[in-house]
Regions:
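Soluble "head" domains of membrane/secretory-pathway proteins
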Residues: 1-181
Length: 181
């Protein structure tokens, strides 16, 4: 994790003293989990402050524009005996793969109360959220098996740890160990 990509913070009090960059759509970001800041989470940034993020019927749109996606070969989960639909998506200069399970519902039944919850509308097809100032909307690349902003809300800027750029250890996909992002 590059802790300086988004700025330099004072230790202990976590105050940003030098702003360098802001998280961009498509970045893989490490942050302190909003519901328990003692835990670090890693997710992909899909919405930045001011964006309207819509995830309806498993289709992601940002500010009314669908995220460019292409279906590729299905992904086999070696530890479970099933396949997920796999897609390649592009956000700006970032291209990445994500998974969808065609049998999983788009509806999010157990979204909790969270700050700025009023910025989100939940319906049978999914969720639409307006990202507040100094907050980010993040999603996991394994969409139907990810607890992310759809469930627990936005990531405050103050919770950002840094930008992920190197895969240190991935036991489920050893070929990715040591690769750069």
């Amino acid at each position: 994790v590059n802790k300086f990509t988004y700025g330099i913070r004072l230790p202990v009090i976590n105050t940003k003293i030098i702003a360098i960059n802001s998280p961009q759509r498509g970045d893989v970001m490490v942050f302190r989990y909003p519901e328990d800041p003692s835990l670090d989470y890693i997710k992909r940034v899909v919405g930045v402050p001011g964006d309207t993020v819509s995830y309806q019927n498993k289709r992601l749109t940002i500010n009314g524009l669908p995220v460019e996606t292409t279906k590729v070969f299905d992904y086999h989960h070696p530890e479970r005996l099933y396949y997920s639909e796999q897609y390649v998506a592009r956000m700006g200069d970032v291209e990445y793969k994500y998974l969808n399970d065609s049998d999983a519902p788009a509806f999010i039944p157990d979204a909790t109360r969270f700050p700025f919850r009023e910025n989100c509308t939940y319906n049978a097809a999914g969720v639409i959220c307006k990202v507040p100032d100094r907050h980010y909307f993040v999603m996991g690349d394994n969409r139907d098996n990810s607890r992310d902003s759809r469930f627990w809300g936005f990531v405050p800027e103050r919770n950002i740890v840094g930008k992920a750029f190197f895969i240190w250890l991935n036991l489920s996909s050893p070929s990715r160990i040591g690769s750069f992002k």
